[in-house]
Design a protein with these regions (language model features):
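N-terminal hydrophobic/helix-forming segments and targeting peptides
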Residues: 1-355
Length: 355
């Protein structure tokens, strides 16, 4: 397996792409794959579809990963110049007070802070309560007149942090959900190209608006109409204190890709993913999904007449916080798994269960 391209990964993670504002990351993807893909098209939603044409008649495979990240949106500017905000996606209000944030405007990006009364001024009974998001404000440290000049209602805000390596082989950043996936599925295309291509088409679908309802994955799967749809997304690591593994499963950072199994997953796709991992000598983990998953796989499976669908993940600690943590070696291990899965397909494979 190759080393992680940390420069590319860092650029993805630190480029803002709050749901509905994914254009800058889409530009990075188009630039990255410009000399690799045979075709690149962007649909009206903003999802980028990069296609590597196959050499034969094997099933076409679309792998999706969403470009959007959670964040905040400006809803009101007070006469004093403070910003009120709403969540875009699943933001935990409990982690926001005292945080540095970046406000993205037409004229540039401005650092702000989420205000918090000092503990000395908080009543004892108030200290134990989470301040609702609608009661939090962002301070830009500017006169109100300037704030109202540069900030517009609807401007988006990201956590004011970026990519760092730490510990042994680990990394921390905002937005590994799901820019880790964007990294992986673009790298899969590069690896397939280097290998001379597959027998069927590979479509790298970097999608939009997953965090508010799987909207990009839905429209991409319908529009492209591939034979096989695989979603890549992060899943919850359960290897830190406070997580009940008997309830949530045992999933460890650094123990390899996670392959989902359940009614949302085509059984042939599942078995072939496991077989590919074994062929490549890649350690992998299994995750039980007894219901429809909350990933693009949930939407892609029921497009048109139904799609042979899979879900591959890596274990991630502290999802939807500014300090999401992954093991870097899991990235390229997943690239190798997905590459092997695609290369193993031929025109005789059937994804109809039991046939």
């Amino acid at each position: 397996m190759k080393k992680v391209d940390k420069t590319y990964l860092k650029s993805l993670l630190e480029t803002p792409s709050v749901t509905g504002s994914e254009v800058k990351v889409a530009n990075l993807v188009r630039e990255r794959l410009a000399d690799t893909a045979d075709e690149i098209e962007t649909n009206v939603m903003g999802s980028v579809h990069s296609r590597l044409k196959g050499k034969g008649n094997a099933p076409s495979v679309m792998i999706s990963a969403h470009m959007d990240e959670i964040g905040l949106m400006v809803t009101y500017i007070s006469d004093s110049g403070y910003l009120s905000v709403a969540a875009v996606g699943g933001v935990d209000a409990a982690i926001l007070p005292g945080m540095r944030v970046d406000v993205h405007t037409e004229s540039g990006t401005y650092r702000g802070v989420v205000g918090r009364k000092p503990i000395h001024l908080i009543e004892p009974d108030e200290r134990k309560k989470v301040t609702p998001l609608e009661n939090l404000v962002i301070d830009l440290g500017m006169p109100a007149k300037k704030v109202k000049k540069i900030v517009r209602i609807g401007d988006v805000i990201t956590f004011g942090v970026g990519f760092e390596k730490f510990g042994k082989g680990m990394a921390v950043s905002r937005a590994f959900d799901d820019k880790a996936g964007v990294y992986i599925i673009t790298r899969v295309m590069e690896e397939l190209k280097e290998a001379g291509g597959a027998q069927g088409d590979y479509i790298c679908a970097t999608t939009v608006q997953e965090e508010i309802g799987l909207r990009g994955g839905t429209t991409s799967a319908y529009g492209i109409n591939p034979d096989v749809c695989i979603a890549f997304d992060v899943t919850h690591a359960t290897d830190y204190p406070g997580i009940d593994q008997s309830k949530h499963g045992k999933l460890l950072c650094g123990d390899g890709p996670v392959i989902a199994r359940g009614p949302n997953i085509n059984p042939v796709v599942f078995e072939r993913l496991c077989k590919a991992a074994k062929e490549e000598g890649i350690p992998f983990q299994l995750e039980a999904e007894p219901r429809v998953t909350g990933t693009d796989a949930g939407a892609m499976q029921i497009q048109r007449g139904g799609k042979a669908t899979g879900l591959v993940s890596i274990a991630l600690r502290y999802m939807h916080t500014p300090t999401e943590v992954i093991c870097l070696q899991d990235l390229e291990a997943t690239v190798a798994l997905l590459k092997r899965f695609i290369l193993d397909l031929d025109e005789d494979v059937s994804f109809v269960p039991g046939v």
